[in-house]
């Protein structure tokens, strides 16, 4: 049973969407692979939850930007 797996310590709020997504994929892979002790599994799971939330924030921001541009375009065309 492995007790140490490197966990990225970069603050999540400093990661872009792609970096969050890629790290989240790696966290899921490690958890699905198994062989980690409980403490490491919990740390990875917590990091994964934070990464998933940050990915959603990035996607929400992108959706809002698209909506703003489309709304501005409609106003210009009116």
Curated annotation (Swiss-Prot):
Record SUPFAM superfamilies: XseB-like
Catalysis: reaction(s): Exonucleolytic cleavage in either 5'- to 3'- or 3'- to 5'-direction to yield nucleoside 5'-phosphates
This enzyme's EC code(s): 3.1.11.6
Gene3D superfamilies on file: Exonuclease VII, small subunit
Keyword Cytoplasm: yes
Assembly and interaction partners: Heterooligomer composed of large and small subunits.
Name of protein: Exodeoxyribonuclease 7 small subunit
Gene assigned in the entry: xseB
């Amino acid at each position: 049973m492995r007790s140490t797996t490197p966990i990225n310590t970069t603050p999540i709020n400093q990661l872009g969407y792609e970096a969050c997504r890629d790290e989240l994929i790696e966290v899921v892979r490690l958890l699905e692979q198994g062989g980690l002790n409980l403490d490491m599994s919990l740390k990875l799971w917590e990091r994964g939850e934070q990464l998933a939330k940050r990915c959603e924030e990035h996607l929400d921001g992108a959706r809002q930007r698209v909506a703003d541009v489309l709304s501005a375009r409609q106003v210009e065309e009116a």
